[in-house]
Amino acid sequence: RKTLLTFGLNLSSSVVLTPGDSVGEHLPKSGITFIIGLVVDDIVVIEEHLRIHTKARVLVQFSDIALLYNEFVQAFNNSDGAKHLLFATSLPHWADVDTTSETVRRFHEAVPEVEKWTPLSLLGFATGRLMQRNLQRMDLATSDLLSGLFFNETFITVDDMQYGAYKDAEGVATAEESLSNFGATDISVWSMARALRSDEPVLQDPMSPSMVYTVPNGNALTPAQLDWCGWCRFACADTGSRLTVFLCCIMRNKRDNDNAPKELADPVTLIFTDIESSTAQWATQPELMPDAVATHHSMVRSLIENYDCYEVKTVGDSFMIACKSPFAAVQLAQELQLRFLRLDWGTTVFDEFYREFEERHAEEGDGKYKPPTARLDPEVYRQLWNGLRVRVGIHTGLCDIRYDEVTKGYDYYGQTANTAARTESVGNGGQVLMTCETYHSLSTAERSQFDVTPLGGVPLRGVSEPVEVYQLNAVPGRSFAELRLDRVLDVLDIFGEGTAASTSDYSSTLAELSETAQAIAVSLQSLMGVFTQAQRQGTLMPFCERWRVRCPRKVHPRGTTATVRRLSVALQ
């Protein structure tokens, strides 16, 4: 009742069956019926009812599916009613041989017998992996310490499964008031047809429902009172909208800085992200990119919140993220790649763009470049790549931490920020790179949860010595082109020739410019990105003369780079 009320629905009726009662007598010919605590004999009755009454739907608990899986399979196999039996789960498909889920892959390796691939066995395996991970962190294992670990960490990720948030409620709650989803996230709705065949689509994409419920009480309004209130709310609408605007004005400078690293003596782990070839994508898909980038921003921000990290800033489609925990940072980067892989982008044009770009690069090159993804078998490609590709760089170290009175937030400067940005900028789309400082900041138990490949020493611009870099294999099986070490990296390289320019060139120097200068540079990018080099030079001249910024008269490949950089600083 609480769930239905929260989402604005009503419970038409409820029936408590006694032993010997048949569930079939109470199933309606249409609508949704939720059955709790069914018995084996109910399964055949439900199958027959759903097969005959195509407008009826029956929702059962996942625990019933798991415990009585063989009976459900026997009853619903090859039945039209399978599409109308529904349940919710956060598990990936236990029998998907083409899975992208690391949990299922490990499960299949541990349990090679296909007949043992059931939801209950996968649930047990995932639980075992969770306990294995937690016990590695404990010198002494007791029930209190184990439960405390969940609440202390809030979010826990094992392979590709995330658990949490676990929040220890204040005070003592009665059983009637306590509500829990036991830490499940990314809950999707399946039909029994999908349980039988992994290629069947889910009915509801994964979501993490709110745990804030509207609790009914004895003083609830009657329908007549609600009708009267409906008339009244029109009179209040204008007042409410004005109040909303007023509150927004008050709160617009408010920023949540709770998760921002603030201690100068504590190492900070910085993450930089960037969408590969976003400038060219905007030029070729201007009608699709706004929604795609908005989805990208929303997903990244949800991960920042999930892992208690801090959004420092965004420039274009690049994120700078600060983390108190290197483990949380690496978890965030890994889940980012997995979520983008699983996301339904609603189009294939981004994948087609990357394929065409790689093929064009191969044709125009000297024959040494081999497209890493363009020539993959379509089925293999689908398991490894999907939609926009985001590169990620991670580095850990001490920072110059400053509070900005304008943005009301914290910013991070110095060599740590520069190294993190440079690490991201040499990567490829879909690739996650971390420095040895980040890797060695992880405990042995934490490292065991990630698949990494050492890449050796990598020269980074602005860093005196080559940096040991590790590749996080967030999506096993992906291959990448060589690191982009030949890139000329400066804040305004995006004004250089070529269609592969992207805002990573900004992210690589975020730590070197102020917030205002960055905003000016982004605006100039948007205005001048489609101009030729000569047109840019001519457009910049009046601004430079007005603001007394030195501007070289001769047009050369790097002319506007230095000019616009100086102009951005002068105008801030």
From Swiss-Prot:
It is a multi-pass membrane protein. It catalyses: ATP = 3',5'-cyclic AMP + diphosphate. PROSITE patterns: GUANYLATE_CYCLASE_2. GO terms for biological process: cAMP biosynthetic process; intracellular signal transduction. Its main location: membrane. Residues 269-424 form the Guanylate cyclase domain. One of its GO terms (molecular function) is adenylate cyclase activity. It is an enzyme of class 4 (lyase). Could act as a receptor for an unknown ligand. Its EC number is 4.6.1.1. Residues 1-225 are extracellular. Its cofactor is Mg(2+). Binds 1 Mg(2+) ion per subunit. The chain crosses the membrane at residues 226-251. Mg(2+) binds at residues 274, 317. Keywords: ATP-binding, cAMP biosynthesis, Cell membrane, Glycoprotein, Lyase, Magnesium, Membrane, Metal-binding, Nucleotide-binding, Receptor, Transmembrane, Transmembrane helix. Glycans are attached at residues 10, 77, 152. InterPro entries: A/G_cyclase (IPR001054), Adenylyl/Guanylyl_Cyclase_3/4 (IPR050697), Nucleotide_cyclase (IPR029787). Residues 252-572 are cytoplasmic. It comes from the Eukaryota. It holds the Pfam family Guanylate_cyc. It is found in: Cell membrane. This is Receptor-type adenylate cyclase GRESAG 4.2. GO terms for cellular component: plasma membrane. Belongs to the adenylyl cyclase class-3 family.
